[in-house]
Regions:
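Short, flexible, glycine/charge-rich loop motifs used to bind or transfer phosphoryl groups or to couple energy/partner
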Residues: 4-6, 33-34, 124
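Core catalytic region of metal-dependent phosphoesterases/phosphodiesterases
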Residues: 11-13, 17, 22-94
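Short, flexible hinge/linker loops that cap or flank conserved catalytic cores
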Residues: 7-9, 37, 127
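Acidic, histidine-bearing metal-coordination/catalytic regions of metal-dependent phosphoesterases
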Residues: 1-14
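Active-site neighborhood of divalent metal-dependent phosphoester bond hydrolases
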Residues: 56-126, 130-135, 141-142, 147-159
Length: 159
């Protein structure tokens, strides 16, 4: 799925977070500070859940939470593509990228995590309180949201 669509009830508080980079404990502390309600609220992550920090598997586990959704960032892409391309794997394992943890996983778990991260959408469109909000990890190739969605849906753009 390249584009994911969500409609969020008006009584839900929506929070958005950037690059978590495996800092699960810090994320949970910040959610507590802002009064995040796990039974009612929604947290949207704009990619880069993993790498660089120490709590990678916990951050991947966020994808199983009903209150959490994410799009794919370049670090999720590194995990998946690094399983098949030695050049990407080499780059991903460099200390500044922080991907070593991924290749230390047992093979079956590494494949499962890589596949799960690759399933994340590239674009997220949220309808909330009568408005439409669009999320991507980085930049779009065009400045028109609808055109960008169509390009991704029709596979004119590879991510």
């Amino acid at each position: 799925m390249k584009v994911k669509y969500l409609e969020v009830d008006n009584d839900v508080n929506v929070f958005v977070v950037g690059d978590i980079h495996a800092c699960y404990t810090l994320l949970k502390e910040k959610l507590k500070e802002v009064g995040f309600n796990y039974n009612r609220d929604l947290l949207i992550a704009v990619g880069d859940l993993v790498d660089r920090g120490k709590e990678n598997e916990k951050c991947v586990g966020l994808l199983n939470e009903h209150w959490f959704t994410s799009i794919k960032g370049n670090h999720e892409d590194f995990c998946y593509k690094g399983m098949m391309d030695d050049h990407i794997k080499f780059y991903h394992r460099m200390p500044n990228n922080g991907g070593e943890w991924f290749y230390e996983l047992p093979d079956d778990l590494m494949e499962a995590v890589g596949r799960r991260l690759n399933q994340l959408p590239i674009m997220l469109e949220v309808k909330y309180k009568g408005k439409k909000f669009g999320f991507v990890h980085a930049d779009l190739p065009v400045q028109d949201w609808e055109l960008a969605k169509e390009m991704f849906r029709s596979s004119q753009l590879i991510a």
